[in-house]
A protein has these predicted regions:
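Helix-boundary capping/turn motifs
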Residues: 24-28, 46-51, 68-72, 143, ...
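A short mid-domain helix/strand-loop element embedded in enzyme catalytic domains
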Residues: 138-146, 170-185
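Detector for short helical micro-motifs
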Residues: 45-66, 159-179
Length: 209
């Protein structure tokens, strides 16, 4: 099909479990915000969106198996709705895997020759470099579940920006914590401390949603 799911996920109906430590693992340490930013601390732009979308997709596909996957880059490019998934999209995916590895989110085992499919192993989403394990939901290991509709509906269309995708995740977490689920708020005064994201990202994300 158009998204390449015929090759794909074995966790139908389960969505992607994302630890709340991805938002803030310690005061001042925000893995999602750092993933959205360039390594020099600048805005992540389109690259930030691709990194976040690809990591979420890997969690969806690989979190329930041995936490690794051996799928061609074109599969991921189709899953993310990239143009020209067999060529340009695939190159973008491969360069993004390399960036995610440098940042401590994945391990890449490259094939024996140029053009061979790499094995991608998911690591802990806090970017600690620790092996991935399925979150338990117990104290200290809480998580949100990203609905598979993100990929199947799909919600993850080209119109969704990096800030929009980040705010989508923040909304899922806020909804889970809210007492009044009919009216969610994202106060500017606490937003940066909680998520490490700028006021500009908050505004752009809310507008995009």
């Amino acid at each position: 099909d158009g998204m390449g799911l015929s090759e794909g996920p074995s966790r139908r109906g389960l969505g992607a479990p994302v630890r709340t430590a991805f938002f803030m693992k310690a005061p001042g340490e925000h893995p999602m915000a750092s993933l959205m930013s360039g390594r020099q601390g600048s805005g992540g732009g389109r690259g930030g969106r691709t990194r976040l979308a690809l990591l979420l997709s890997l969690i969806w596909v690989a979190s329930g198996q041995d936490h690794s996957t051996h799928r061609p880059a074109s599969f991921w490019a189709r899953l993310l709705g990239m143009p020209d998934p067999g060529e340009t999209g695939a190159r973008t995916v491969n360069s993004t895997w390399a960036e995610l590895e440098q940042r401590g989110f994945v391990k890449v085992q490259r094939g024996p020759h140029a053009g061979a499919v790499s094995q991608i192993t998911l690591l802990d989403e806090s970017a600690s470099g620790a092996p991935y394990r399925i979150p338990t939901g117990s104290e200290g290991d809480r998580y949100i579940r990203v609905p598979e509709a993100l990929w199947l509906a799909p919600v993850l269309t080209p119109e969704v920006t990096g800030p929009g995708l980040a705010l989508y995740l923040v909304t899922l977490r806020t909804y889970g914590l809210a007492r009044n689920k009919d009216r969610l708020t994202f106060p500017a005064g606490t937003f940066h401390d909680r998520y490490g994201l700028s006021e500009s990202t908050r505004k752009k994300g809310l507008k995009n949603l």
